[in-house]
């Protein structure tokens, strides 16, 4: 808006100096109006083309009716606020876990704020080890949160079953937790209730042991210059600085230290017969390795626990440093990721071919890649992404892309001895600028999936129809300028200006986009 006003002011000054009489005549007014409108259209087009695309933009409080969109299959679990129902999407056949929260139990203003804050945080977080929210809607009686089905159950139940974990397995789990926490802290989000009950196993496959951090009801944004004061958390895992009412994001690291201690020993470091006794022991910060279970545990593992359970948060290890701790590197260095070569070749081809400046097409593809794919469909791509993510923070930076690109070419069987490093860097820079849809300088997990996935799989009729419905808010069968403005959060701009954007796709010049035009746009983008 400021840019627009400044530009119009410059035009007026120029006209006043050059030819004042034109401002008094009808032709002069029309000329100025036309130039002003032209500039407005150019500004909205630039705003649109420069808008940042994130998967969270597609999670809006929609008018979905549960029984029309989903079929409930069975109850997966119950809690004090509601229940989680295994449900099938009637249009795509995909299964989801839907958290159904009764509004009777969300009467207090603070409870509703907590729920809405959780939704907002999940909208912005995009990480392999953080639960993915697909949809959020409500009716007169309930709120609905739609997420993936994680069939492996809680880490808590796995601990009960195993009693304790081998060091290598404990390291694999805590590395993933720390990866998620590193990403969260980098984005100024603190969880504040990390515990085995809030860590789910993606599948029942004991070899993969992919974890997902859930339950962001107590999470919040934080500022590095300010301390938090709310005394919240769970007795066994709460940090002493939280009990004292002055703490920072490293309260999450304390919780990770407690979890690692439990994984290796089967016992909590701070125990008691009731919550009061537990909290008193937490307040002292004193724990012991003088248990029979710890006799066979390496000094390096104990060293990481010590650094995580430092009483003073200022000297407590950070999430990123913990992720790079020697014990974690040692225990996970031999993790072999068996990558399917045909999937690898296809993903490299798709990434290199992805070239688009058409924001609407990018947005539609991001929605389909991030919200309409299943865990099984993205399994191989997840392996490739994790192999490229050298520092384990859940994002790919420029250096990781360069190193990873070379490694993937080797895996594919290409001879990389004569590769021109400068040429590779140029190619990586082109890839980064093309697929960094939120323009933050990194490739997020969903961005990678979106551009690397099999186009034939992604552009199925069912997925295209569901994606079209996201844009077509009123169900008219056409996407209007107003609907586009609503999705991209630029609703204060006139619909006339949006029509300049629609023209790129609007083949029959009716000022709207029908399903055929929408489908053709995506097929053209994907060279499919």
Swiss-Prot record:
ATP binds at residues 76-84, 99. A motif (J domain EF-hand interaction motif) lies at residues 359-368. It comes from the Eukaryota. Keywords: ATP-binding, Calcium, Cell membrane, Cytoplasm, Developmental protein, Differentiation, Kinase, Lipoprotein, Magnesium, Membrane, Metal-binding, Myristate, Nucleotide-binding, Phosphoprotein, Repeat, Serine/threonine-protein kinase, Transferase. One of its GO terms (biological process) is cell differentiation. Myristoylated; myristoylation may target it to different subcellular compartments. During male gametogenesis, myristoylation is required to initiate DNA replication but not for mitotic spindle assembly or axoneme activation. GO terms for molecular function: ATP binding; calcium ion binding; protein serine kinase activity; protein serine/threonine kinase activity. The active site is at 193 (proton acceptor). Signal peptide: none annotated. It is found in: Cytoplasm; Cell membrane. Residues 70-328 form the Protein kinase domain. Ca(2+) 2 binds at residues 436, 438, 440, 442, 447. Its EC number is 2.7.11.1. Residues 1-11 have a biased composition (Polar residues). CDD domains: EFh, STKc_CAMK. It is a lipid-anchor. The keyword Glycoprotein does not apply. Ca(2+) 3 binds at residues 472, 474, 476, 478, 483. Its main location: cytoplasm. One of its GO terms (cellular component) is plasma membrane. Belongs to the protein kinase superfamily. Ser/Thr protein kinase family. CDPK subfamily. Calcium-dependent protein kinase which acts as a sensor and effector of intracellular Ca(2+) levels probably in part downstream of cGMP-activated PKG kinase. Plays a central role in the host erythrocytes and hepatocytes infection cycles, sexual reproduction and mosquito transmission of the parasite. During the liver stage, involved in sporozoite motility and thus in sporozoite invasion of host hepatocytes, probably together with CDPK1 and CDPK5. Involved in merosome egress from host hepatocytes, probably together with CDPK5. May interact with the pre-replication MCM complex prior male gametogenesis activation. The junction domain (J domain) is composed of 2 motifs that maintain the kinase inactive. The N-terminal autoinhibitory motif acts as a pseudosubstrate inhibiting the catalytic domain while the C-terminal motif binds the EF-hand domains. This is Calcium-dependent protein kinase 4. It comes from Plasmodium yoelii yoelii.
């Amino acid at each position: 808006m400021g840019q627009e006003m400044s530009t119009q002011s410059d035009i007026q000054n120029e006209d006043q100096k050059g030819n004042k009489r034109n401002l008094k005549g009808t032709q002069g007014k029309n000329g100025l109006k036309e130039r002003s409108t032209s500039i407005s259209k150019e500004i909205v087009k630039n705003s649109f083309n420069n808008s940042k695309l994130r998967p969270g933009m597609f999670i809006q409080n929609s008018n979905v009716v549960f029984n029309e969109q989903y079929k409930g299959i069975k109850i997966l679990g119950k809690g004090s606020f509601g229940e989680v129902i295994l449900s099938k999407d009637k249009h795509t056949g995909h299964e989801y876990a839907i958290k159904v929260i009764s509004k009777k139990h969300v009467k207090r203003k603070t409870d509703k704020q907590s729920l809405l804050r959780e939704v907002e945080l999940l909208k912005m977080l995009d990480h392999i080890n953080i639960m993915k929210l697909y949809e959020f809607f409500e009716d007169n009686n309930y709120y609905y949160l739609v997420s993936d089905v994680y069939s492996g159950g809680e880490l808590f139940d796995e601990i009960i079953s195993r009693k304790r974990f081998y060091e290598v397995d404990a390291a694999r789990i805590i590395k993933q937790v720390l990866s998620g926490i590193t990403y969260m802290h980098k984005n100024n989000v603190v969880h504040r209730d990390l515990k085995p009950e809030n860590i789910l196993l993606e599948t029942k496959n004991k070899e993969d042991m992919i974890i997902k951090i859930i339950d962001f009801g107590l999470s919040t944004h934080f500022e590095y210059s300010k301390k938090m004061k709310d005394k919240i958390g769970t007795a066994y895992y709460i940090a002493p600085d939280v009990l004292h009412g002055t703490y920072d994001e490293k309260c999450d690291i304390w919780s990770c230290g407690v979890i690692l201690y439990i994984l290796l020993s089967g016992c909590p470091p701070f125990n008691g017969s009731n919550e009061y006794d537990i909290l008193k022991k937490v307040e002292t910060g004193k724990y012991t390795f003088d248990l029979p279970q710890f006799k066979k545990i390496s000094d390096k593992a104990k060293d990481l626990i010590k650094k995580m359970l430092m009483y003073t948060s200022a000297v407590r290890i950070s999430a990123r440093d913990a992720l790079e701790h020697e014990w974690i590197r040692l225990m996970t260095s031999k993790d072999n990721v068996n990558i399917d070569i045909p999937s690898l070749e296809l993903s490299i081809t798709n990434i290199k071919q992805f070239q688009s400046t058409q924001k609407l097409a990018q947005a539609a593809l991001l929605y389909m890649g991030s919200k309409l794919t299943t865990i099984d469909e993205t399994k191989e791509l997840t392996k490739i992404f994790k192999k490229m993510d050298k520092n384990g923070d859940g994002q790919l930076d420029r250096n990781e892309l360069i190193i990873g690109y070379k490694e993937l070419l080797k895996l594919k069987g290409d001879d990389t001895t004569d590769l021109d490093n400068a040429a590779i860097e140029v190619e990586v820079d082109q890839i980064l600028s093309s697929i960094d849809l939120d323009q933050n300088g990194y490739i997020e997990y969903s961005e990678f999936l979106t551009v690397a996935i099999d186009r034939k799989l992604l552009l199925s009729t069912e997925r295209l129809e569901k994606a079209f419905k996201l844009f077509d808010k009123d169900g008219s069968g056409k996407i209007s300028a107003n609907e586009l403005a609503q999705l991209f959060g630029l609703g204060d701009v006139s619909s006339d200006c949006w029509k300049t954007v629609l023209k790129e796709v609007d083949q029959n010049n009716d000022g709207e986009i029908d399903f055929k035009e929408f489908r053709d746009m995506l097929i053209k983008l994907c060279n499919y």
